Design a protein with these regions (language model features):
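Acyl-group handoff/entry surfaces in thioester-processing enzymes
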Residues: 1-3, 7, 43-120
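Flexible, low-complexity inter-domain linkers and amphipathic docking helices that mediate domain-domain
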Residues: 2-51
């Protein structure tokens, strides 16, 4: 199998703005970028990257938007812990997983853009 060339992230930490040139995996105008950033709590400081949805993600979003009640891709569970220490340890472990994997910090943005995008 051949190698895949993935462009490096061009959004620098602490940057004051995001421009189209910083987004090699998304085709967005400056007004669309501004609309996306406005929907992220904390604004540009909390945007790590913006890119297009994969075909599978487009399908998941389609079913989510089509669902009248509930979300076919969202499951819930109830967990019980026998002590606060175990709960805190579980929460710390979950935070490590979230910090490590971009997809767990990703949101789909559909408003203010011509095509949906994902924002990390």
């Amino acid at each position: 199998q051949g190698e895949i060339d993935i462009p490096e992230n061009r959004i620098l930490p602490g940057g004051a703005s995001i421009t189209p040139e910083m987004l090699p995996l998304a085709t967005l105008s400056q007004p669309e970028i501004d609309a996306v950033v406005a929907q992220v709590p904390g604004g540009v400081a909390n945007v790590q990257d913006i890119y297009a949805l994969s075909p599978l993600q487009e399908g998941i979003l389609f079913h989510h938007l089509l669902a009248e009640r509930g979300d076919p891709y969202q499951l819930s569970a109830v967990l019980r812990f026998d002590s606060r220490a175990r709960l805190d340890a579980w929460l710390a472990a979950m935070q490590q997983v979230i910090d490590r994997h971009d997809i767990l910090r990703t949101a789909f943005i559909t408003q203010g853009v011509s095509s949906p995008v994902q924002v990390v």
